Amino acid sequence: MEYKLVIGLEIHVQLGLKTKAFCGCKNEFGGVPNSRVCPICLGLPGSLPSVNVELINSAILAGHATNSKIRNVVKFDRKHYYYPDLPKGYQISQNDKPICEGGSLLIETPSGPKKINIIRIHMEEDSGKSLHLLDSENQSYVDFNRSGAPLLEIVSAPDINSGDEAVAFLSSLREIFRYLDLSECNMENGSFRCDVNVNLIVKENGVEHKTPIAEIKNLNSFKSIKAAIEYEELRQQQEWIQFKKTLNSCGKHTRGFDDRSGVTVIQRNKETVSDYRYFQEPDLPLIEIDDSYIDNIKNLKLIELPFHARIRLKGQYGLSDFDVITLTADKHLLKYFEEAVINSSDPKKVANWILSEVLSVLNDKGISVLEFNLLPSYITELVEFIVAGKISGKMAKRVFSEMMTRGVSASVVISENQLEQVSDKFVIKQIVLEVLDENPKSIELYKKGKDHAIKFMMGQIMKKSSGKINPILANEILLESLSNV
């Protein structure tokens, strides 16, 4: 018996537009409950929606970035269902004619790049948010501030075959939306939400069977998504062994994931398309988008995306996979590196400093590179001092620390503290000879093969120079001098 895990993702991205999808209310997170609502948000009689053009523009950008075909006619539909946080009794969405279809993304896997197809991207409005009191089973509240917020829903094909691949796809998609400034994609505040559809293809006695699809909800982190998939894979294997349930006999159902117990719990049978009673939104006309408009949006706003940036960085600067993945995870960090490397003679060393020292500071302080107090050129200058042998790597960390404290360049710190290394071979030779004259016993120990004698003499050399001598040159000259004694 063989099992193949099959996963499809439904991702809701709340766009960072100034106003909501179909009205002029502010589109912001949080705030006083029900303070950003209007008759359109609340579905009051007589209210008429109007399309936020930036919603369409955002969908065009997302479609182009995911290699999707963009439709020239936009049609909105009503999706009917009842829930307390949906005041109209329907959601304005898109059913049979989504704005984008047939896209794809490449993800990195241990066996190399893998193409994950995207079935569709469509526009819709968000619902309100239900709040249930922990100390009461009888009281719930609804905040409609989120009602009508602009969403894009991205539906992947069932091309994903592991929890790691699902996380890789979501990470790649999130990077794209952040690069394009379409959304913060913050799972904690709900601007990036994902439902996971999981089932198995079971091959038994030469016959393939599909297990019932479980749509898993309540997933608030990539860690939860991976854990839910791995649990569901095992659960469905056991269910098949015990009950032989198939997709044809049982259909699709919804399950919730409990972070604390790490298990999925059945919630309800999944609605079908007919249950939603879709029909065209009568209050919104068809909107025609010609190719020139689509091209104009692409040309105005589209930038180099992470996947392409990684390829370029590896070829241009010879950086490792780890380096380019980390640098491109944040477009502002990538920009910082690109500015720092412009006048650098050693791009790899610049990358190392940014990925170690700079990122360490950012993480410790909980700030972004936009809030960092050192200009990219300051890192370039510091690295050039190291490359030129004017300061040691150890000294560079001391310099960097003072640069951080004062917000000044490396040259200022080095000049004021007279920290520049002595690299003059004649000067170094004189100090080496002095140390040899003062330590004849160490010379004898060295000739007997005692390695610690070299370390002792190097220590004396550094002491005489107050730590300012170039240690690499000093070591070379010391060994050369010892060979002549």
UniProtKB/Swiss-Prot annotation:
Family annotation (InterPro entries): Asn/Gln-tRNA_amidoTrfase_suB/E (IPR017959), Asn/Gln-tRNA_Trfase_suB/E_cat (IPR006075), Asn/Gln_amidotransferase (IPR018027), Asn/Gln_tRNA_amidoTrase-B-like (IPR003789), GatB (IPR004413), GatB_Yqey_C_2 (IPR023168), Gln-tRNA_amidoTrfase_suB_CS (IPR017958), Gln_synth/guanido_kin_cat_dom (IPR014746)
Class in the EC hierarchy, top level: ligase
EC number: 6.3.5.-
Protein's UniProt keywords contain tRNA processing: no
GO biological process, one term: glutaminyl-tRNAGln biosynthesis via transamidation
Gene Ontology MF terms: asparaginyl-tRNA synthase (glutamine-hydrolyzing) activity; ATP binding; glutaminyl-tRNA synthase (glutamine-hydrolyzing) activity
Nucleotide-binding found in the keyword field: yes
Signal peptide stretch: none
Catalytic activity: L-glutamyl-tRNA(Gln) + L-glutamine + ATP + H2O = L-glutaminyl-tRNA(Gln) + L-glutamate + ADP + phosphate + H(+); L-aspartyl-tRNA(Asn) + L-glutamine + ATP + H2O = L-asparaginyl-tRNA(Asn) + L-glutamate + ADP + phosphate + 2 H(+)
Assigned keywords, A-Z: ATP-binding, Ligase, Nucleotide-binding, Protein biosynthesis
Gene3D superfamilies: 1.10.10.410
PROSITE patterns with a match to the protein in the record: GATB
Oligomeric and partner information: Heterotrimer of A, B and C subunits.
Protein role: Allows the formation of correctly charged Asn-tRNA(Asn) or Gln-tRNA(Gln) through the transamidation of misacylated Asp-tRNA(Asn) or Glu-tRNA(Gln) in organisms which lack either or both of asparaginyl-tRNA or glutaminyl-tRNA synthetases. The reaction takes place in the presence of glutamine and ATP through an activated phospho-Asp-tRNA(Asn) or phospho-Glu-tRNA(Gln).
Family membership: Belongs to the GatB/GatE family. GatB subfamily.
Protein name: Aspartyl/glutamyl-tRNA(Asn/Gln) amidotransferase subunit B
